[in-house]
């Protein structure tokens, strides 16, 4: 019930394939010996990517491999002649300068561009298995991609599952590299105000090699210091959860003037930056 299988035909056009998501594609033979292409999306927020197998802990299978294995049960009444996992990589280049109209709000303009990016033309097709040339040609025709842009890989098409695997195996410390902790900068003295220290002389932090704590402490001190009336900063790339933003918001709530220049075009972090700029 959580999957939406599609059989491409006259009544059902080729579906839109989202950028970077995994699909199971299958070649189906009808009773009349005609071939059809069937597609099942493997990405679903309701399904976990890694499925633990019975018979003992530590054995897992990716949901897309499970779907591909049993795909014949989904398309009952058809003969499976070939199958593979498929991933489409779409163009991510957006020319903001060429399309921008000075009469538009730039933030709203960038939001529209982010929506357009999701629908840009495919530039690459990744397959997990070899497929008949006629099928590959059909996929290329549907997606408007040349055959030299089709690649086959025995490795998983999306390795982001490693982060989930990391959480599952957290107790097995022997499987992990020793954690690298940012070093405590020798530039700063303990027990003294960061603002006072940078007033006396310039300081340099190189993140992630140096700990960012002195910088965050400086912002917190500035937010709480009555002598600070204004904070001005330039931010290029912001995370979904940002302690820098938390400190700046605290400063604004304490009556400080907070002016931040945010780069809305930080590649692949545009959505975070747009959200925080509000």
Give the positions of each predicted feature:
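N-terminal localization/anchoring segments of enzymes in phospholipid and broader phosphate metabolism
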Residues: 1-278
């Amino acid at each position: 019930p959580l999957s939406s299988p599609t059989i491409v035909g006259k009544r059902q056009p080729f579906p839109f394939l989202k950028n970077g998501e995994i699909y199971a594609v299958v070649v189906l033979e009808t009773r009349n010996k005609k071939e059809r292409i069937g597609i099942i999306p493997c990405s679903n927020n309701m399904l976990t990517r890694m499925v633990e197998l019975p018979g003992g802990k530590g054995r897992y299978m990716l949901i897309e491999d499970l779907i591909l294995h049993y795909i014949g049960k989904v398309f009952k009444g058809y003969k499976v002649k070939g199958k593979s996992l498929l991933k489409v990589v779409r163009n991510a280049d957006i020319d903001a300068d060429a399309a921008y109209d000075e009469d538009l709000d730039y933030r709203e303009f960038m939001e529209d561009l982010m929506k357009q990016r999701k629908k840009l033309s495919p530039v690459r097709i990744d397959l997990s298995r070899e497929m008949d040339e006629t099928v590959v040609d059909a996929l290329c025709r549907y997606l408007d991609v040349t055959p030299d842009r089709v690649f086959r890989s025995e490795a998983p098409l999306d390795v982001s599952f490693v982060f989930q695997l990391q959480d599952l195996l957290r107790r097995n410390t022997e499987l992990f590299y020793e954690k690298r902790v940012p070093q405590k900068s020798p530039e700063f003295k303990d027990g003294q105000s960061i603002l006072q220290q940078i007033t006396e002389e310039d300081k340099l932090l190189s993140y992630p090699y140096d700990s960012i704590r002195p910088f965050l402490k400086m912002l917190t001190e500035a937010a709480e210091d009555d002598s600070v009336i204004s904070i001005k900063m330039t931010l290029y790339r912001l995370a979904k959860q940002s302690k820098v933003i938390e400190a700046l918001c605290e400063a604004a709530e304490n009556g400080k003037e907070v002016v931040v220049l945010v780069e809305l075009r930080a590649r692949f972090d545009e959505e975070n930056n747009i959200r925080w700029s509000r």
